[in-house]
A protein has these predicted regions:
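Conserved AMP-binding/adenylation subdomain of ANL enzymes
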Residues: 210-227, 235-277, 283-295
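Conserved pre-ATP/AMP-binding loop-to-beta segment of ANL
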Residues: 33, 147, 152, 160, ...
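Conserved structural elements of the adenylate-forming
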Residues: 52-57, 168, 174, 187, ...
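Conserved AMP-binding A3 loop
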Residues: 45-49, 178-180, 187-211
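Conserved AMP-binding/adenylate-forming core of the ANL superfamily
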Residues: 33-80, 84-88, 105-110, 114, ...
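AMP-dependent adenylate-forming
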Residues: 5, 23-47, 155-158
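Structural core segment of the AMP-binding/adenylate-forming
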Residues: 64-65, 92-165
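Conserved ATP-dependent adenylate/AMP-binding module captured primarily in the ANL superfamily
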Residues: 104-134, 168, 210-229, 262-276
Length: 302
């Protein structure tokens, strides 16, 4: 198709530079001292600067384990800081995050492992036994299993490693890569719960992520001064992309972590953290409404 100008430079720049990760890194530069993650249950928070440093440590650890472009990193994680780090770290080195439903039974988890053949599995401490059973059932054996978000103080299974030990001593510098990113690179696989059949994976490429972020940013609208709490699991489309990690880290606002929905905590956190957007299913909102009627909280920030 002929143009009235030479579009080759624009096409090259758009296809290789207009990535979700570049948007995130823009926020690291602009808002390095601004909160990116707030975890009320552990009383911890990460700024965009400190988050990026931890993401880089995770990415370097993955590289040390031989993870490279198009390899799969499987995350069976509840909403947690570890999920946020897992959302960004693999794409820094060209790997694909498989966001698995942590509620799956061990047989279904084994099916996902055999189908996707992840090189690394990172999982929440509360599903340790499910992962151990899945390991026994699946044919594919990951090279590393990482126990993360260990608020239960679970013992580390033999042959596994804690997330903290895994990233210990790793460089905070940007990881080196030997490829040029492209907007059509697969960066994320979302897994259905298997409601109508066996669990399946849905591939999302980088431009899917960028356009999903833009859609939410424009529709809400979101800005860097917002604080978002998605009350649903981040492993699915609604949790990840509706005020979850995807648009929030792209626009530069804060994400408040909620591992399991609790109406009272939700209302308390709105006031405490000046939350501007709450996302959830109708059932969540109905429960919030009842709790607010019983014990009114200051929701003026919403």
């Amino acid at each position: 198709m002929s143009r009235t100008y030479d579009d080759s430079m624009f096409i090259d720049t758009f296809e290789h530079e207009y990535t979700w990760l570049n948007g995130f890194m823009r926020n690291v530069r602009r808002f390095s001292a601004k909160n990116a993650i707030i975890d009320p249950e552990t009383n911890r928070s990460w700024t965009y600067g400190s988050m990026n440093k931890e993401v880089n440590r995770f990415a370097h650890a993955l590289q040390k384990d031989g993870v490279k472009k198009d390899d799969i990193v499987m995350a069976a994680l509840r909403n947690s800081p570890a999920f946020a780090m897992s959302y960004v770290a693999p794409r820094k080195i060209g790997a694909i995050l498989l966001a698995a439903n942590f509620n799956l039974a061990s047989g279904e988890m084994a099916l996902l492992i055999d189908h996707n053949k992840p090189k690394i599995i990172i999982y929440s401490a509360n599903i340790k036994n499910v992962i151990l059973e899945a390991e026994k059932k699946c044919s594919h054996k990951p090279e590393r299993c990482i126990l993360a978000d260990n608020i239960e103080n679970e013992a580390i299974p033999e042959g596994h490693v804690s997330y903290e030990d895994y990233i210990e001593g790793m460089s905070e510098d940007e990881p080196q890569i030997n490829f040029r990113p492209h907007i059509y690179d697969e960066v994320l696989r979302l897994c259905t719960s298997g409601t109508t059949a066996l669990p399946k994976s849905v591939p999302l490429n980088d431009i899917n992520e960028v356009l999903s972020a833009h859609d939410v940013i424009m529709h809400y609208p979101l800005n860097p001064n917002d604080a978002c709490l998605n009350m649903t699991p981040w492993f699915h489309r609604g949790g990840c992309h509706c005020g979850g990690p995807c648009p929030s880290f792209y626009v530069g606002c804060a994400v408040v972590v909620m591992r399991a929905f609790q109406p009272k905590n939700t209302l308390d956190w709105v006031s405490k953290y000046s939350i501007t957007f709450l996302m959830g299913a109708p059932a969540n909102l109905e429960m919030l409404s009842r709790a607010q009627e019983r014990t009114p909280k200051d929701l003026s920030s919403l």
